[in-house]
Amino acid sequence: MTTDAPQKAVVLFSGGLDSTTCLAVARRDGFLPCALSFEYGQRHKVELEAARRVAKAMAVTTHLILPLPLGSIGGSALTADIDVPKDRDIGEMEADIPVTYVPARNTIFLSMALGWAEVLGASDIYIGVNALDYSGYPDCRPEFIAAFEAMANLAVKEAVEGRLAIRIHTPLLHLSKAGIVELGTSLGVDYGLTHSCYDPAPDGLACGRCDSCLLRRKGFEEAGVADPTRYRPSL
């Protein structure tokens, strides 16, 4: 007796807490995850090492890392010589669009994922956007995701011809960071392999002070789960 092979799904995958949880959710949902990462000129390039570690630990058989020179465009603290904000409270984080916003990044990432999905014959794309903890980012909003999905179904040959419908999955969209940690923990995610810091030390240790580090620490604390992150010794 033979069984049908699981359907493929493209998972946008940075090696961070959110995208790793998203990868675990895609697998839980019965898909064969095809992980897609980008080397886009980010100052925290160490996240790609985390992505490789996680992919290996989770036995991901297809992991593509694409070069994408967004550093040539700049305009973000993650891709240009702009200071990463530190020691901000939640109110400050949510007050406006932060300088860590990378212009059109999720639009570009999702477009690349869409192209790869078309080649793979996949109709499902997972992205770990979160509208609660990153309310300042325009490309993490439900309206953006809905608009991109509508566009995708007008852009892909087989969707236009009626043979498939592109679905953008956002399982973390309305979860708090604590809720994400709880979900991933229930799915067996090893968060010690992941990386979230925007401004890591040369040896990869997290700064513990950027928005991403602070939200990550807050998530573990509120979830009552031990934080496995390795922070700089001064913290």
From Swiss-Prot:
Molecular function terms from GO: ATP binding; ligase activity, forming carbon-nitrogen bonds; zinc ion binding
Assigned keywords, A-Z: ATP-binding, Ligase, Metal-binding, Nucleotide-binding, Queuosine biosynthesis, Zinc
Cofactors: Zn(2+)
Record bears the keyword Protein biosynthesis: no
Reactions performed catalytically: 7-carboxy-7-deazaguanine + NH4(+) + ATP = 7-cyano-7-deazaguanine + ADP + phosphate + H2O + H(+)
Residues given in the record as Zn(2+) binding sites: C197, C207, C210, C213
Pathway listed: Purine metabolism; 7-cyano-7-deazaguanine biosynthesis
Record Pfam families: QueC
SUPFAM superfamilies in alphabetical order: Adenine nucleotide alpha hydrolases-like
EC number assigned by the record: 6.3.4.20
The keyword Ligase belongs to this UniProt entry's keyword annotation: yes
Reported function: Catalyzes the ATP-dependent conversion of 7-carboxy-7-deazaguanine (CDG) to 7-cyano-7-deazaguanine (preQ(0)).
PANTHER family: 7-CYANO-7-DEAZAGUANINE SYNTHASE
Protein name as it appears in the record: 7-cyano-7-deazaguanine synthase
